Swiss-Prot record:
This is Non-specific lipid-transfer protein 3. The lineage of its organism: Eukaryota, Viridiplantae, Streptophyta, Embryophyta, Tracheophyta. Residues 1-25 form the signal peptide. InterPro entries: Bifun_inhib/LTP/seed_sf, Bifunc_inhib/LTP/seed_store, Plant_nsLTP. The gene is LTP3. SMART domains: AAI (SM00499). It comes from Hordeum vulgare (Barley).
């Protein structure tokens, strides 16, 4: 009887741990917004190249987005942020990773299907 109770307790603990990991897995839009806020002026057409702080944020975000869930969450957040910023030039936005020396596993575009990002 005690053995069955101990087994159930272990199973409950494992399920709880998996749920905690799953909820923390994806990058938040707050993280994406914070990392990329230094890029807004450039994305609106100001400057010939992204500022150093912008590239630092892009690199930090690329390093944090390792799992498929992270990449898909970042993709969705990028699209949401792009629609909320007035005067944004998507041509400049799509070129930011390359200008910062960062490889991104999906095109930065409003037409990107974030569910297909891996």
């Amino acid at each position: 009887m005690a053995r069955a109770a101990a087994t159930q307790l272990v199973l409950v603990a494992m399920v709880a741990a998996m749920l905690l990991v799953a909820t923390d897995a994806a990058i938040s839009c707050g993280q994406v917004s914070s990392a990329l806020s230094p890029c807004i002026s450039y994305a609106r057409g100001n400057g010939a190249k992204p500022p150093v702080a912008c590239c630092s944020g892009v690199k930090r975000l690329a390093g944090a987005a390792q799992s498929t869930a992270d990449k898909q969450a970042a993709c969705r957040c990028l699209k949401s942020l792009a629609t909320s910023i007035k005067g944004i030039n998507m041509g400049k936005v799509s070129g930011v990773p390359g200008k910062c020396g960062v490889s991104v596993p999906f095109p930065i575009s409003m037409s990107t299907d974030c569910n297909k990002v891996h």
